[in-house]
């Protein structure tokens, strides 16, 4: 089976760890220094459910920046990672509007999405409970939810692998259909 390409967009407020999660997944390293992203694109080939996949991951600026570019990201993306920080209420509270914007741009209710509560290694600074994340995921229509830590490599691969599975379920790839004959007997 040929290599299938996936366009994944990572969205959320500035400082939630979008770049850290993406770089941890793609390169296997944790970026300690915070350097605000304008836009970075990464490619990684992975195997999911015995299928070779080429991921193009767009790591975006925080939601408070470059809003004009966001509609374009959303239009082209096949799946979305919505990230908040478990140590910040405001990053969590922005996600319902972000999800609504994705649904509006895609003009679809069934968009592959993963909700991620990042920085779960900072449990002593936690202000958003796991239950709050689970409840938001339910409100999003049983969106896949998990907590992650880019620093400690917790659930990082699962974010992207689950998203690939969702995209595959929505757009399955089967064997090419044979062209039907357009011949008619009279």
Curated annotation (Swiss-Prot):
InterPro entries: P-loop_NTPase, Rap1, Small_GTP-bd, Small_GTPase, Small_GTPase_Ras-type. Disruption phenotype: Null cells exhibit reduced viability in response to osmotic shock, reduced accumulation of cGMP in response to osmotic shock and decrease in growth rate. It is found in: Cell membrane. Residues 184-186 form a propeptide. GO terms for cellular component: cell cortex; cell pole; cytosol; extracellular matrix; leading edge membrane; lipid droplet; pathogen-containing vacuole; phagocytic vesicle. GTP binds at residues 12-19, 59-63, 118-121. Disulfide bonds: none annotated. PROSITE patterns: RAS (PS51421). It catalyses: GTP + H2O = GDP + phosphate + H(+). It comes from the Eukaryota. Interacts with ralGDS (only when rapA is in its GTP-bound state). Interacts with the Rap guanine nucleotide exchange factor glfB. Belongs to the small GTPase superfamily. Ras family. This is Ras-related protein rapA. It comes from Dictyostelium discoideum.
């Amino acid at each position: 089976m040929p290599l299938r390409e996936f366009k994944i967009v990572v969205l959320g407020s500035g400082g939630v760890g979008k770049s850290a999660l993406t770089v941890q997944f793609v390169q296997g390293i944790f970026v300690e220094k915070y350097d605000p992203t304008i836009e970075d694109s990464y490619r990684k080939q992975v195997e999911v459910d015995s299928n070779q996949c080429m991921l193009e991951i767009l790591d975006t600026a925080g939601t408070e920046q470059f809003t004009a570019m966001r509609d374009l990201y959303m239009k082209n993306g096949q799946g979305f990672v919505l990230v908040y920080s478990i140590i910040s209420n405001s990053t969590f509270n922005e996600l319902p509007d972000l999800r609504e914007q994705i649904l509006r741009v895609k003009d679809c209710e069934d968009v592959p999405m993963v909700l991620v509560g990042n920085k779960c290694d900072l449990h002593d600074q936690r202000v958003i409970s796991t239950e709050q994340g689970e409840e938001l995921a339910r409100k999003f229509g049983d969106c896949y939810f998990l907590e992650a830590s880019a620093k400690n490599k917790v659930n990082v691969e699962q974010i992207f692998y689950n998203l690939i599975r969702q995209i595959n379920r929505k757009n399955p790839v089967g064997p090419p259909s044979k062209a039907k004959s357009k011949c008619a007997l009279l």
